[in-house]
Swiss-Prot record:
PANTHER family named among the record's database cross-references: SNF5
A matching Pfam family: SNF5
UniProt family annotation: Belongs to the SNF5 family.
Provenance organism: Arabidopsis thaliana (Mouse-ear cress)
Assembly notes: Interacts with SWI3A and SWI3B, but not with BRM.
Function text: Component of a multiprotein complex equivalent of the yeast SWI/SNF complex, an ATP-dependent chromatin-remodeling complex, which is required for the positive and negative regulation of gene expression of a large number of genes. It changes chromatin structure by altering DNA-histone contacts within a nucleosome, leading eventually to a change in nucleosome position, thus facilitating or repressing binding of gene-specific transcription factors.
Tissue specificity field: Expressed in roots, stems, leaves, flowers and siliques.
UniProt name for this protein: Chromatin structure-remodeling complex protein BSH
Gene Ontology biological process terms from the UniProt entry: chromatin remodeling
Length: 240
């Protein structure tokens, strides 16, 4: 499956999302004048900045939000894009890094929990395609679940990519004074990656069989309206 085949690239690369499409995960949670707007989507950092304001105006119009939300939405998107762009041009070190991705999401009435391995070094990976296949294999019918799964994957990959910038910086400093020690650390990391690859075959279906570790078995539940109302009430209390 696309996104789960190791490329074998070990050297540092310039910072970007470790996926085929370099898209920034944007999350909005804005409260203003007694109303709340929440959304999550991806944004191409190469798009012109004026697209942000256009998007904010269109969103406010479509959702009939107070016009003051335009500034709030635009500023939040711009701030997150600026954070991403601050890393562009810096080296990030991925090495042979097979990482666990964890899902714990509720989308409408669907609750989905899963954990699987992802090759951070595969820059041809496609979270959206992976999410579509996952939902198909699990029999998930709600069309909003797939995009939410893909977004959750991208958010985690983004955080790890940021950490990889720090790793590249530390690696450069270490090589100046402790080359022997670096070699040992790299060997251990490589060995761990290979051990994980032996345990989990990336050629298998997204749905894990029962013979695999229980922690890697996906769980999908359909919640009742009462359960959803209770969860939303709890989320509202935590948001205050």
């Amino acid at each position: 499956m696309k996104g789960l085949v190791s490329t074998g690239w070990k050297g540092p690369v310039k910072f970007r999302m470790p996926t085929a499409e370099n898209l920034v995960p944007i999350r909005l949670d804005i409260q203003f004048e007694g109303q709340r707007y929440k959304d999550a989507f991806t944004w191409n950092p190469s798009d012109p900045d004026n697209e942000v304001v256009i998007f904010a105006k269109r969103t406010v119009k479509d959702l009939k939000l107070p016009y003051a939300f335009v500034t709030q939405i635009a500023q939040s998107i711009q701030s997150q894009l600026s954070d991403f762009r601050a890393y562009e041009g810096q080296d990030m070190y991925t090495g042979e890094k097979i990482i666990p991705i964890k899902l714990d999401l509720r989308v409408n009435h669907t609750l989905i929990k899963d954990q699987f391995l992802w090759d951070l070094n595969n820059f041809e990976s496609d979270p959206e395609e992976f999410a579509r296949t996952l939902c198909k294999d699990l029999g998930v019918e709600d069309p909003e679940v797939g995009p939410a799964v893909a977004f959750a994957i991208r958010e985690q990959l983004y955080e790890i990519a940021i950490q990889s910038v720090a790793s590249a910086r530390e690696s450069r400093l270490s090589k100046k004074g402790r080359r022997g020690s670096d070699h040992g650390s790299a060997s251990k990391a490589s060995g761990l990656s290979m051990d994980l690859m032996k345990l989990f075959s990336f050629k298998s279906s997204v749905v894990r069989k029962r013979k695999d570790l229980d922690v890697y078995e996906p769980v999908v539940d359909l919640l009742t309206s009462e359960e959803v109302d209770a969860l939303e009430a709890r989320e509202e209390r935590h948001a205050r």
